[in-house]
Amino acid sequence: MDDAEKKEAVDLSRRLSARYRERDKSAVAIGSRQEAAAYLISRMPATYAAARDAFGFVRDSMGEPGAGNIKSMLDAGAGLGAASLAACESFGINELKCVERQTHMRSLGEKFMRYASGESLNIEWADADVASVPFTKSFDLAAVSYLINELEEGVLSKTLKSLWEITESILVIIEPGTPECFRRLLFARDMLLGAGAIMLAPCPNGNKCPLPDDDWCGFHVRLPRGRLHKKAKGGEAPFEDEKYCYAAFSKTRHISKGARIIRRPELMKGHARLRLCGGDGIQTVTVSKSDGDAYAAARRARCGEIFYKINKKV
């Protein structure tokens, strides 16, 4: 982009950001090539970072050889391909299908993905609405990110049923980290578990979510801001935090002996306190310096990871 195009993209980025804030970061229609470029600058870095973080947790939950068998992916509502690129970092994907109904997002996404992925990845783009497209081919991984909060429950159920049917291994849903999006994620969770899906992450099992109705489960990732990104956001902070929630479902059972850290660890002198969701529900665990390796692990741990060295409750 030349200087004039960059300035236009920055101005549009700020307007897009305002629209996303008004709609709680849910999907906003992109009506021009310039708006798609503005989205690339202002929102894609964060959605990519969230997807990369989530897929990393999913891979950890799968372990080997399961994660190594993920070779093909369907990205439903692909946008510019943020989730696709993120998944390629966690899995050895060599075949990718991106479904995107917005013309300008799809057009820029095709160009960006060719540039970002090189020639080694076989990518097919489809001009279709994920809520109505008939899927005829199966994929190891199906993913839908930053989309389900826009769908009515009936449409969402139909869409997820269709995606689950063509999933060979895992289905991953990623949404903005808000209470409203978490509620919609719980709806999707209940629907998929009822269809026979096996809970993979972040929940330790398919039991009813143990959180009270006024609480919710979300994670966050910190990403750096470049010069153009700072201008688009209208600030000088060198980083931003993207909150997200996710759920991953599997066709086969994976065994996890740990518990998920669902809050930022509290680090104090001589001990650390972790809020965990495990097979026995939610518990708060205090790990002290005298616990040796467990204490060192707790000091390094971050929200979203699996903690294996559970010692004692508060």
Predicted ranges, named:
Residues 1-25:
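N-terminal auxiliary segments of SAM/dcSAM-dependent transferases
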Residues 29-54:
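Class I SAM-dependent methyltransferase Rossmann-like catalytic core
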Residues 69-79:
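Conserved class I S-adenosyl-L-methionine
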Residues 80-93:
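Conserved SAM-binding loop of SAM-dependent methyltransferases across substrates and taxa
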Residues 102:
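Conserved SAM/SAH-binding beta-strand->alpha-helix loop
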Residues 140-154:
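A short SAM/SAH-binding and catalytic strip from SAM-dependent methyltransferases
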Residues 167-177:
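Conserved beta-strand signature within the Rossmann-like core of class I S-adenosyl-L-methionine
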Residues 232, 236-314:
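C-terminal lobe and adjacent flexible extensions of AdoMet/dcAdoMet transferase-like proteins
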